[in-house]
Amino acid sequence: MNPLLQDYARILLEWNQTHNLSGARNLSELEPQITDALKPLEFVKDFKSCLDIGSGAGLPAIPLALEKPEAQFILLEPRVKRAAFLNYLKSVLPLNNIEIIKKRLEDYQNLLQVDLITSRAVASSSFLIEKSQRFLKDKGYFLFYKGEQLKNEIAYKTTECFMHQKRVYFYKSKESLC
């Protein structure tokens, strides 16, 4: 793991002792989550902008932003404690490429359009697509970090799913919605 990701992990574990941001209690529990956040870089199309919905403790957005400093990231996180943590990360790590917005997806009214929309453990895929597709460029993609429950959330093609261990990465183009 690169030094910046190690710094992120260390800070998250420190904050986690008092703020309960993640289920991970030590580095051996957190490292697989960071690896999981970065795995899609092996198959996603290159992107210059990303909207992460429900950023929480920063997974997957912070590892992605650290690995892709040339891309711009908007992190939507409505909870005060988690948004404060994300702002702290921005102040101590080289994360000039992120903007933290303390709002729920449904309340976010910006007109921006991004190349990629990500989400991990937030809501059903159908809900996320319905509420966020207006923020996605016509040639953009959704990337949702899911598990086996995906089959109960939305109809999908097998070509829209990539698997790694127990994770299902749902990767769908906006064009395929039509």
From Swiss-Prot:
Q: What's a Pfam family in this record?
A: GidB
Q: Which Gene3D superfamilies match?
A: Vaccinia Virus protein VP39 (3.40.50.150)
Any one cellular-component term (Gene Ontology)? cytosol
Per UniProt, the enzyme's principal EC class comes to transferase
Ordered alphabetically, the record's keywords are: Cytoplasm, Methyltransferase, rRNA processing, S-adenosyl-L-methionine, Transferase
Q: Quote the CDD domains the UniProt record gives.
A: AdoMet_MTases
The places in or outside the cell where this protein is found are: Cytoplasm
Q: Which family does it belong to?
A: Belongs to the methyltransferase superfamily. RNA methyltransferase RsmG family.
Its function, per the record, reads: Specifically methylates the N7 position of guanine in position 527 of 16S rRNA.
Q: What PANTHER family does its record include?
A: S-ADENOSYL-L-METHIONINE-DEPENDENT METHYLTRANSFERASES SUPERFAMILY PROTEIN (PTHR31760:SF0)
Listed name of the protein: Ribosomal RNA small subunit methyltransferase G
Q: Which organism is it from?
A: Helicobacter pylori (strain J99 / ATCC 700824)
